[in-house]
């Protein structure tokens, strides 16, 4: 109960997330992905309101991608490269999810794709779909099924599981 689940998009957000975790009065998990990121020391730390997401607009959005961790920047960069208008959401909190932003996103009446490079079951897409269970909205989900993934390079495993950014953009083309 009251467990906060989060995953920062970069080193700066990670430092602020840990600062937020120590300041909160709740059990708090900060997930981090395989691989590494460049360290960028914060000169000062700021609290991130628990359960809030942030939006990034690329061009004139025709679709929404909800993702987290380093994939936020990967999707933004790939959208710019492909000249695709997207609203990219940094879903830095899985629990609680940002219900206010979800309602605002639904009002935009754009196709929504949840892009997670982790197991879908019990992940962000599950939390969003659970929240939207009584609504008639179309959400597309890319993620790893409920099975063991063998060892390998991050790139080869993402291709194998259908969760590379190339796979994401193939999926987006189907809905665009």
Give the location of each predicted region.
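Thiamine diphosphate
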Residues: 23-176
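Conserved thiamine diphosphate
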Residues: 1-23, 171
